[in-house]
Curated annotation (Swiss-Prot):
Keyword Plastid: no
Name of the protein in question: Meiosis expressed gene 1 protein homolog
Ranges in a coiled coil: none
Biological process, per Gene Ontology: cell differentiation; spermatogenesis
Naturally occurring in which organism (per UniProt): Danio rerio (Zebrafish)
Disulfide bond annotation, renumbered to this chain: none
Gene: meig1
Lineage: Eukaryota, Metazoa, Chordata, Craniata, Vertebrata
One GO cellular component term: nucleus
Family listed: Belongs to the MEIG1 family.
Length: 92
C-alpha cells in the first residue's frame, strides 16, 4: 500500500483478486473480512481507532464490528488452507 493511499481517507480499490496462498498479509485480510471490512484501510476510515495486534506475530488481535461487538483472534494462524481462496486482496 502506498503512503499516498494511507493519507487519502476516501481511497477506493481499483481492482480485486483472490489470494492464492497463505501469507501474513492474507491472514490479516481474512480477519478484517470476517469482521465485515474490506481491509485495514476501510476499518481505519470507519472506526478511526488503533488496531490491536499481537506483538510477536503482528496479526490482528481484536476488531470491532459495525454493530459494535468485538471479534477476538488468536495469536496463531486462523485462516486455514481451505479458506485462503475466499480472501479478497484489493489493489489501490
Amino acid at each position: 500500500m502506498a503512503c499516498a493511499v494511507l493519507l487519502d481517507n476516501n481511497a477506493k480499490p481499483k481492482s480485486m483478486s483472490r489470494a492464492k496462498q497463505w501469507t501474513g498479509e492474507v491472514e490479516n485480510l481474512y480477519r478484517f473480512q470476517q469482521a465485515g471490512y474490506r481491509d485495514e484501510l476501510e476499518y481505519r476510515q470507519i472506526k478511526q481507532a488503533e488496531i490491536d495486534r499481537w506483538p510477536d506475530t503482528g496479526f490482528v488481535k481484536k476488531l470491532q464490528r459495525r454493530d459494535n461487538t468485538f471479534y477476538y483472534y488468536n495469536r496463531k494462524r486462523e485462516c486455514e488452507d481451505r479458506e485462503v481462496h475466499k480472501v479478497k486482496v484489493y489493489a489501490y
